[in-house]
C-alpha cells in the first residue's frame, strides 16, 4: 500500500505563515502525498508551486463552523477553483442538521457541488458534535446531494476521527461515496486503523511522521 496517496497533508491553523505553507508543499512533493489541504488564502500560491507535481491542492469551504450562507460557500468554491483548487472540503450547516432542517442541509451541499463543477467535494459533518443517528443522516444527505466524500471532522471542534465513526459513515454511504478521516491521526497505527475501518483518505498535519512511523503531538 502506498500510504502517501491516502494522505491530505494539512495545515489549517489560523496563524499559518507562508514559510510554513512552503514547508508543507515541499514535504508533499517529497513524499508524494495526495494533496496539501490549506486555507483559501494560500490556494493560488500552492497551485503555482505544485503545478508540475502529482500533488493536488485541497482547500476548505465555510471553515471551520459551516455557518456561512450557501451563497457565501458557493462563492468561496468559485474563487478557490479559479485560484487553482482541485478539491474542496466543506462544512455542513450543523445547526440545521440538529434542528432536522434536512432540506436546508441538502441544498447547502448541492450549492457547493454545483459551484465546484467537476472538482472533488468532501462534506465535513463534524462527528464530535453529532449523535450516531445525526451522523447517519448527515452521511445520507451528503450522498443525496452529490458529494464525493463524507469527512469526519474539522479538527477545530474538540474532537477528531474515530474508528467507530468511520465505520458508521462507510456503512451508510457504501461504495457511492468515499470516507475521509481527519483530526487526531498522529501516527502510522492511527492511520492504518482508519484505513481498515473504511477510510480512503486521511487528513493529517502529521503526514511525514505517519510515513516515517513516528508520533506527532498535533490535534489535526
Swiss-Prot record:
EC nos: 4.1.2.4
InterPro entries in UniProt: Aldolase_TIM (IPR013785), DeoC (IPR011343), DeoC/FbaB/LacD_aldolase (IPR002915), DeoC_typeI (IPR028581)
Gene Ontology MF terms: deoxyribose-phosphate aldolase activity
Any single Pfam family the record assigns to this protein: DeoC
Pathway in which the depicted protein is active: Carbohydrate degradation; 2-deoxy-D-ribose 1-phosphate degradation; D-glyceraldehyde 3-phosphate and acetaldehyde from 2-deoxy-alpha-D-ribose 1-phosphate: step 2/2
GO terms for biological process, alphabetical: 2-deoxyribose 1-phosphate catabolic process; carbohydrate catabolic process; deoxyribonucleotide catabolic process
Catalytic activity as recorded in UniProt: 2-deoxy-D-ribose 5-phosphate = D-glyceraldehyde 3-phosphate + acetaldehyde
Active-site annotation: 89, 151, 180
GO CC annotations, alphabetized: cytoplasm
Segments crossing the lipid bilayer: none
Keyword Cytoplasm belongs to the record: yes
Family designation: Belongs to the DeoC/FbaB aldolase family. DeoC type 1 subfamily.
Its biological purpose: Catalyzes a reversible aldol reaction between acetaldehyde and D-glyceraldehyde 3-phosphate to generate 2-deoxy-D-ribose 5-phosphate.
Protein name: Deoxyribose-phosphate aldolase
